[in-house]
């Protein structure tokens, strides 16, 4: 992908994302699993590229993300890294690869060697010691709270989280504990918009929403969902950005623009308590 290199384009860093949050500029994030789409997302101004374990669904045809292995994540991270020039590259720690802080470090180090600049892991305040352990060893962390797909069986399915007073209070505790442990980014999935706004307001780090309303610091979607090439029923928070667009590039640019101007997510993509 050397033909895409442009020395005038500035690299997106964690401090850059923090500055965007403080300035009120929305952050656009999308998934990618190969070098071609990675290069296209980067070229279209996507600030954060996520190598998600969602590859289990959209690349491997799995029903859940649970079968995805660390080896799968390393391979796809390497591919995405080769296509990316400026976006911040985040990779998921897959199911079963962070049972202890020490094991989490081994897994995260493998992803960092493959080209990740930050790792994402799913869980609440119980993960704070692991996050602290990673951050102290120079591994930036994005935490993922709310609906955590790796916990699909424990949660009883893909359900909106934080709908009761008790679960909403726990989500707030989770977010604060993970920030205090050193997380520099938090993804909130399938959370009522009002609750996500409250969590965002109580934190000093950026939040990225997926089905969490417009008041998060930014938004993320699975690429195959937003360009409408993944068959089957779509989640409520998905919008088909290919509609009315002449190309995938145009759809990605439309997504970035909609995130930036706050028109996505709209009310129809949002959950209420």
UniProtKB/Swiss-Prot annotation:
What EC number(s) are associated with this protein in UniProt?
A: 2.1.2.11
Q: Which residues form the active site?
A: 189 (proton acceptor)
Q: What is its main location?
A: cytoplasm
Q: Which sites bind Mg(2+)?
A: 53, 92, 122
Q: Which UniProt keywords apply?
A: Cytoplasm, Magnesium, Metal-binding, Pantothenate biosynthesis, Transferase
Subunit text? Homodecamer; pentamer of dimers.
Instruction: Write down the HAMAP family for this protein, in alphabetical order.
Output: PanB
Q: Please name the PANTHER family in this protein's record.
A: 3-METHYL-2-OXOBUTANOATE HYDROXYMETHYLTRANSFERASE
User: This chain belongs to which protein, by name?
Assistant: 3-methyl-2-oxobutanoate hydroxymethyltransferase
Q: Which organism is it from?
A: Cupriavidus metallidurans (strain ATCC 43123 / DSM 2839 / NBRC 102507 / CH34) (Ralstonia metallidurans)
Task: Tell me what gene encodes this.
Answer: panB
